[in-house]
Amino acid sequence: MTKYLFSDFDNTLRNSKVKNSLRIDQKDLDFIKEFQKNNKLIVSTGRPYKQLKEHLLNEYNLMPDYFIVNTGAMICDNKGRILYKKTIDNKIKIQLLNFLKTIVNQIDVIVFATSENESFLFHKNWSKDVEKFFFGLEKLNKTLDYLYDKDLLCLKIECSQETWNKIEDFINKNNLEVNITFNSINNRLFNEIHAFKVSKGQAIKGLQEKLDISSDDIIVAGDDYNDISMFEMFYKNSYMCKHKHNENIRNKARYLIDNIWEIKY
């Protein structure tokens, strides 16, 4: 039977043990390409479709069969056809943007994603390293007004914990039905706001129904908090790549590994 591997990208598929390397380990790459000969690879990531697809093709001649992007807000095939998407409710979006405008001077970075693209709305600490890490994501230098007519898959916000607490308090006090994904990049808080009930696990469920895949044929691999929904819904064949940052959640996956080439199928 065909197996379907749903793998996170950062620190899972791209998980070099060479310090400061941003390359996929060759042994992992060989494993994936061998796996794809008779099975299906789905990259399940917080990153956007367009930039990740180009990166994998240009750097590794690797083409996943499907992409779950923006932490489960959208599913595409490798031709760019959208199979599923869930955008933030328009009324909720307007309430959020109105509030963010009142504290925008406390926010360092805002990234927004639509089904067409993902861009930095603004970035107050721009550098070539930032551009490289985000695969050349465009910086628009726009205000929040730019987003009012956009159908948003998600907002990603870099700010202090104090500022984030204000955002979360606003969401809770106004009973805004959204999903929050907690992240950090280079020890800076970088959280995501998605539509209600968006997660990688829910997206896998959606693709499973569309393609009529047995749960026995689904393998999930990840390393971080935004992968927990995958582990919970598909625990039987769940793998976690060990890192310092996931010591507190290692019980969420059935198997612990150092690299994805260790996955059994």
Swiss-Prot record:
Pfam families for this protein: Hydrolase_3 (PF08282)
NCBIfam families according to UniProt: Cof-subfamily, HAD-SF-IIB
Taxonomic superkingdom: Bacteria
Gene Ontology CC, one term: cytosol
Protein name: Uncharacterized protein MCAP_0867
GO molecular function terms listed in the Swiss-Prot or TrEMBL record: magnesium ion binding; phosphatase activity
PANTHER family xref list: HAD SUPERFAMILY HYDROLASE-LIKE, TYPE 3 (PTHR10000:SF8), PHOSPHOSERINE PHOSPHATASE (PTHR10000)
Gene3D superfamilies: HAD superfamily/HAD-like
SUPFAM superfamilies referenced in this protein's UniProt entry, alphabetically: HAD-like
